[in-house]
């Protein structure tokens, strides 16, 4: 399957796994916003530390604005392969197109490391 129009870079599996774990940790010890509407609000306010977007969103237009908005606000974002992975890591029993870490809690070190690696990927 071809990459969706909103996927701006390939996320290595190891980095995707690290982001999934950071999202789980932030869900347990910090604050996580779930769902595209909430994520959009936190990006617009500049309060998101890291945005996680699923690669399998259909229709793609649901999340197509998120990378553009995040770049505009200089907020890092990363992709996970499925909505179920994003939803599960965010503490949901269903999939979600996107989530964001607002307060990293115990995942602060991991988030900083992920942000560095994302910057390298986007170069």
Curated annotation (Swiss-Prot):
> What is one term from the GO cellular component aspect held by the record?
ribosome
Task: Name the Pfam families for this protein.
Answer: Ribosomal_L7Ae
State whether keyword ATP-binding applies. no
Q: Where in the cell is it found?
A: Cytoplasm
Which keywords does the record carry?
Cytoplasm, Ribonucleoprotein, Ribosomal protein, RNA-binding, rRNA-binding, tRNA processing
Q: What is its main location?
A: cytoplasm
Thylakoid as a keyword of this entry, yes or no, is no
UniProt family annotation: Belongs to the eukaryotic ribosomal protein eL8 family.
Function, in words: Multifunctional RNA-binding protein that recognizes the K-turn motif in ribosomal RNA, the RNA component of RNase P, box H/ACA, box C/D and box C'/D' sRNAs.
Q: What is this protein called?
A: Large ribosomal subunit protein eL8
The gene for this chain is: rpl7ae
């Amino acid at each position: 399957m071809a990459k969706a129009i909103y996927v701006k870079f390939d996320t290595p599996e190891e980095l995707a796994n690290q982001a999934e774990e950071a999202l789980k940790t932030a869900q347990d010890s910090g604050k996580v916003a779930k769902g595209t509407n909430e994520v959009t609000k936190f990006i617009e306010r500049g309060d998101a530390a890291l945005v996680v977007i699923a690669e399998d969103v259909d229709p793609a237009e649901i999340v197509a604005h998120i990378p553009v908005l995040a770049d505009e606000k200089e907020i890092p974002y990363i992709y996970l392969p499925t909505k179920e992975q994003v939803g599960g890591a965010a503490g949901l029993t269903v999939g979600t197109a996107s989530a964001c870490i607002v307060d990293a809690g115990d995942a602060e070190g991991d988030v900083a490391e992920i942000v560095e690696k994302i910057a390298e990927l986007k170069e």
